[in-house]
């Protein structure tokens, strides 16, 4: 893959990650009660719920910023790997313990797809540095 294609690919991956993430996460700000009804019991610690939501929203904005200049933010990508890996691990452990059902899997599985794309971006961009020909 050429340098220009690697950067363009990275741009689109992070732009889409940010947009999709904002579309998925923003409604959670308004769904606390709905979640409590559809997946009892109700949320008993709203500070944890909203803390999770606003941190997730913050990362989506970070993805949009990274999309503007992916090569510049290359050193940050391993941290993004953790952001996309740790939640699925937590959900799969909770499932193994019988504390959540498979209904909790779509979000973590999507995170693993984004993880694969982020790793692909990292591998491709590491071969390229601005100013190299």
Language-model segments: which ranges?
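Membrane-embedded alpha-helical segments of multi-pass transporters/permeases
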Residues: 29, 64, 92, 119-122
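Membrane-helix boundary elements
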Residues: 6-46
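Non-cytosolic membrane-interface motifs at loop->transmembrane helix junctions
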Residues: 37-46, 75-79, 99-110
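Hydrophobic alpha-helical segments of small multi-pass membrane proteins
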Residues: 77-91, 107-118
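Membrane-helix boundary connector in multi-pass membrane proteins
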Residues: 88-106, 123-124
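Core segments of alpha-helical transmembrane spans in multipass integral membrane proteins
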Residues: 19-28, 44-68, 79-85
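Short, Lys/Arg-rich, polar N-terminal cytosolic tail immediately upstream
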Residues: 1-7, 132
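Membrane-water interface at the C-terminal end of transmembrane alpha helices
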Residues: 113-133
């Amino acid at each position: 893959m050429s340098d220009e294609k690697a950067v363009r690919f990275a741009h689109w991956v992070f732009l889409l990650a940010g947009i999709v993430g904002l579309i998925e996460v923003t409604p959670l700000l308004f769904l606390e009660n709905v979640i409590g009804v559809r997946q009892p019991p109700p949320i008993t610690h709203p500070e944890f719920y909203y803390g999770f939501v606003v941190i997730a929203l913050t990362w989506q904005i970070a993805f949009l910023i990274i999309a503007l200049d992916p090569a510049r933010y290359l050193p940050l990508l391993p941290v993004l790997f953790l952001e996309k890996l740790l939640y699925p691990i937590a959900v799969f452990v909770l499932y193994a313990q019988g504390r959540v059902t498979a209904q909790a899997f779509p979000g973590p599985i999507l995170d693993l797809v984004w993880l694969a794309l982020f790793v692909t971006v990292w591998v491709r961009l590491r071969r390229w540095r601005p100013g190299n020909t």
